[in-house]
């Protein structure tokens, strides 16, 4: 289900666990390491153990910011704007649900705000997603699924709304209104969260129980409308996949077509960006704005993080710079 697609086109429906399995197994290592891939908190809340609760890599973060800044400058020469979205880590939102023997390091708690400040200092256009997710938490709505790595569809849509507002404030999009995605009706589906289904033995998985996934039905759109040029393109991982609705909501809020390139998380943001920039789609129709999505917990990992990305997603820094220059001559 990776690759380029228009918001609003229906996609092959897979079980929640199948959608996320590639991301999780690759990030956590082999199946034999599955038991150590999950932190079991209070009230059945699960957290990914590959996102450290204690360590912060400031040097890696600074390097990633410099790489993103270089991409921004290369895109600017082509009159393409870049909006950077970094999804906050799950654990700081639910610190009270972490096990008592695995508390959050204060440095980890402060990291997201510091990252936002550093990106703005570097001149990057970014959206502070943390307050958006905090506002999402009310009543039965949560920012993240209880036993899942991912944010909820509510978080995805609220972030998409804020992203659309940012884009409309900064850029005058080409094309006529009326090309936005049509949103389907909400429905509930009970399923095991990916952290439970992929990493816990059956007896523990049963004890954790299923989560309720409130998501939208996919809506088939008029293909003539979908053929209109898209002024905005989204690049990211399974957080922006169609199942959770970010791109459809962004298209709906902008009232313009929005295209999407996404891969499972083990491919990494760097290779996914290159996949799009090297594609015939980009060569034939360049967007006005690229929205590039990262995750806080992996932001410090560069293109050369061979222990974290799959073989196709790893490249040396020198090769990365060469590839960017070739894709954006």
Where are the regions a protein language model picked out?
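Extracellular glycan-modifying ectodomains
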Residues: 2, 31-329
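Bacterial N-terminal signal peptides that target proteins for export
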Residues: 3-19
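Bacterial N-terminal signal peptides
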Residues: 17-28
């Amino acid at each position: 289900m990776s690759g380029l697609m228009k918001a609003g086109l229906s996609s092959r429906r897979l079980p929640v666990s199948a959608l996320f399995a590639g991301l999780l197994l690759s990030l956590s290592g082999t199946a034999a390491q599955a038991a150590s891939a999950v932190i079991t908190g209070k009230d059945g809340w699960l957290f990914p153990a590959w996102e450290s609760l204690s360590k912060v890599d400031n040097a890696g973060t600074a390097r990633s910011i410099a790489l993103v800044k270089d991409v921004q400058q290369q895109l600017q020469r082509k009159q393409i704007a870049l909006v950077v979205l970094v999804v906050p880590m799950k654990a700081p939102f639910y610190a009270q649900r972490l096990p008592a023997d695995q508390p959050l390091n204060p440095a980890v708690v402060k990291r997201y705000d510091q990252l936002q400040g550093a990106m703005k200092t570097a001149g990057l256009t970014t959206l502070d997603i943390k307050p958006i997710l905090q506002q999402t938490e009310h009543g039965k709505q949560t920012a993240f699924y209880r036993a899942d790595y991912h944010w909820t569809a509510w978080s995805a849509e609220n972030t998409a709304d804020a992203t659309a507002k940012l884009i409309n404030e900064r850029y005058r999009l080409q094309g006529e209104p009326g090309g936005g995605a049509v949103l389907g009706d909400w429905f509930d589906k009970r399923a095991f969260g990916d952290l439970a289904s992929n990493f816990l033995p059956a007896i523990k998985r049963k004890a954790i129980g299923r989560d309720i996934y409130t998501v939208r039905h996919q809506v088939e759109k008029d293909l003539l409308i979908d053929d209109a040029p898209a002024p905005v393109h989204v690049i990211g991982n399974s957080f922006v996949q169609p199942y959770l609705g970010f791109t459809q909501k962004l298209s709906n809020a902008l009232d313009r077509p929005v295209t999407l390139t996404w891969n499972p998380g083990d491919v990494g943001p760097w290779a996914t960006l290159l996949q799009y920039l090297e594609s015939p789609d980009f060569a034939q129709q360049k967007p006005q704005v690229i929205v590039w999505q990262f995750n806080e917990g992996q932001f410090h990992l560069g293109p050369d993080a061979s222990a974290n990305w799959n073989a196709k997603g790893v490249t040396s820094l020198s090769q990365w710079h060469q590839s960017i220059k070739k894709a954006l001559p």
